[in-house]
UniProtKB/Swiss-Prot annotation:
Cellular localisation: Secreted
Key words, A-Z: Antibiotic, Antimicrobial, Cleavage on pair of basic residues, Defensin, Disulfide bond, Fungicide, Secreted, Signal
InterPro entries assigned to the protein according to its UniProt record, in alphabetical order: Defensin_big_dom, Defensin_big_N, Myo_ane_neurotoxin_sf
Major localization class: secreted
Described function: Significantly inhibits the growth of Gram-negative and Gram-positive bacteria and fungi in vitro.
Signal keyword on record: yes
Family to which this protein belongs: Belongs to the big defensin family.
A single GO BP: defense response to Gram-positive bacterium
SS bonds (residue pairs): C82-C112, C89-C107, C93-C113
Lineage: Eukaryota, Metazoa, Chordata, Cephalochordata, Leptocardii
Pfam families (alphabetical): Defensin_big (PF14862)
Protein name from the UniProt record: Big defensin
Amino acid sequence: MEKKTAYCLLFLVLLVPYTALGAVLKRAPAKKEKRAVPLAVPLVYWGASVSPAVWNWLLVTFGAAAVAAAAVTVSDNDSHSCANNRGWCRSRCFSHEYIDSWHSDVCGSYDCCRPRY
């Protein structure tokens, strides 16, 4: 009989605080919704000149205020510097250059051409 009593007490100890806690949670006031934190423009685009396609993507993703604060400018075409001014966006690379596929996404329809060292 002592075993049943111990089990009953154990279940009472486990269940009673849960029901009391549930009653307290129901009476708690609802929390205010938090404002969405705006996303920051990635550092690779700060102060950069990007293609029109990348410019539109930045505007849609981060908003005009964030893009203006990051000093991102749009170029009239896809021919501009890439890879932190170590390469140039071109439709065809010269013979002394190679295509840097890692940084080509900022070039739009062109490839990021970097010199071979």
